[in-house]
């Protein structure tokens, strides 16, 4: 419990007090935001605002997590390190994208395919790592099964690998596709949500905060726990290192809370792709390692709505040869163009995101009660 509280406090203090230092540094380096010409006119005033704030969030998370372990004497776990690996890996892809934008002085960095290639590379390496490193019980950080609140026995890709060489290729291939899909959906969902001051940061606090609750509860009801009530043995969670997942989630939330102080309207710094891809990677990693992959539809529901609005807009535009459903996508820009103030859009989207997170956590708990 000490590590849980300490990691969040330290990471929040880091970003809260040091973000102004990074803002001045980024301005000196001319790492400023460039704005789409076809975007809302009110956004043009944001041109030149410091970007790549994800660097601060990542550093704050690492500082809070590792210093907390040092102070409490606790040891890290493979699962927690894997969350940080995906977060930093995707953050690096985002940094390259942001850096190219600042060098080229335009709002486009990496090409779409180059960004996808970077995400696929990081996600594929990560997907292979999470089914390695078994502990004394033989449990790996993740499994090859699709999960909702627990692994779904009928959707275990490992079963396919038993059918010879072709089965191995198909089983691992489907597993890698599934993990890449989750990582891409989460990271790009947060990425497209990052279009208004504080929107993606606040939504990420809510979503990742859910995994603090989930990880803590899973640790109490863990099948490996020596204090587990025998009456609950039939509904215990077979999750590797759940408390450590809660600790690293707390460090991330603390870092984003401190960062949000400077990112809220009028923002003095933006997360950039560095931050949005990193936070999306953290969400994906926590969902996969806590065996709650399909529950992410609720916990990350706001990100799904934002990403879905982009997909629907583009598909409808092509099918109707130029017509649009929304005035502009992602959908938060639609409401801006409808006349909503930016802070109103952000506040209402936070409410929607919070309700979806509450529904996700509630579903998680109800499943335990019903088991």
From Swiss-Prot:
InterPro entries: Glycosyl_transferase_4, PNAcMuramoyl-5peptid_Trfase, PNAcMuramoyl-5peptid_Trfase_CS. NCBIfam families: mraY. The keyword Magnesium applies. Catalyzes the initial step of the lipid cycle reactions in the biosynthesis of the cell wall peptidoglycan: transfers peptidoglycan precursor phospho-MurNAc-pentapeptide from UDP-MurNAc-pentapeptide onto the lipid carrier undecaprenyl phosphate, yielding undecaprenyl-pyrophosphoryl-MurNAc-pentapeptide, known as lipid I. GO terms for molecular function: metal ion binding; phospho-N-acetylmuramoyl-pentapeptide-transferase activity; UDP-N-acetylmuramoyl-L-alanyl-D-glutamyl-meso-2,6-diaminopimelyl-D-alanyl-D-alanine:undecaprenyl-phosphate transferase activity. Pathway: Cell wall biogenesis; peptidoglycan biosynthesis. It is a multi-pass membrane protein. It is found in: Cell membrane. This is Phospho-N-acetylmuramoyl-pentapeptide-transferase. It holds the Pfam family Glycos_transf_4. The chain crosses the membrane at residues 3-23, 51-71, 76-96, 113-133, 163-183, 196-216, 242-262, 269-291, 349-369.
């Amino acid at each position: 419990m000490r590590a849980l509280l300490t990691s969040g406090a330290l990471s929040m203090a880091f970003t809260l007090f040091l973000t102004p230092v990074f803002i001045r540094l980024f301005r000196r380096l001319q790492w400023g935001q460039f704005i789409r010409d076809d975007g809302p006119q009110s956004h043009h005033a944001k041109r030149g605002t410091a970007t790549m704030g994800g660097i601060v969030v990542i550093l704050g998370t690492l500082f809070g997590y590792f210093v907390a372990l040092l102070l409490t004497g606790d040891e890290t776990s493979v699962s927690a390190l894997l969350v940080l690996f995906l977060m930093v890996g995707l953050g690096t892809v985002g940094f390259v994208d942001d850096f190219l934008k600042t060098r080229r002085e335009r709002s486009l960095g990496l090409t779409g395919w180059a960004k996808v290639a970077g995400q696929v590379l990081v996600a594929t390496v990560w997907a292979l790592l999470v089914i390695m490193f078994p502990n004394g019980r033989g449990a790996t950080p993740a499994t090859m099964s699709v999960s909702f609140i627990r692994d779904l026995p009928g959707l275990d890709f490992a079963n396919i690998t038993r059918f010879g060489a072709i089965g191995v290729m198909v089983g691992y291939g489907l597993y890698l596709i599934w993990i890449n899909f989750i990582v891409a959906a989460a990271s790009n969902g947060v990425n497209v949500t990052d279009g208004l001051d504080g929107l993606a940061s606040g939504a990420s606090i809510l979503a990742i905060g859910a995994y603090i609750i989930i990880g803590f509860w899973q640790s109490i009801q863990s099948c490996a726990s020596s204090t587990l009530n025998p009456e609950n043995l039939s509904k215990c969670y077979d999750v590797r290192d759940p408390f450590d997942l809660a600790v690293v989630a707390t460090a991330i939330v603390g870092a984003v809370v401190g960062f949000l102080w400077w990112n809220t309207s009028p923002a003095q710094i933006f997360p950039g792709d560095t931050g949005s891809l990193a936070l999306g990677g953290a969400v994906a990693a926590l969902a996969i390692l806590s065996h709650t992959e399909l529950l992410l539809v609720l916990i990350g529901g706001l990100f799904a709505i934002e990403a879905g609005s982009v997909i629907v807009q583009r598909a409808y535009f092509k099918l109707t040869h130029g017509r649009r459903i929304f005035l502009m996508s992602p959908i938060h820009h639609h409401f801006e163009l409808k006349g909503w103030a930016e802070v109103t859009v952000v506040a209402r989207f936070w409410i929607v995101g919070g309700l979806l997170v509450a529904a996700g956590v509630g579903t998680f708990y109800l499943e335990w009660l019903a088991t």
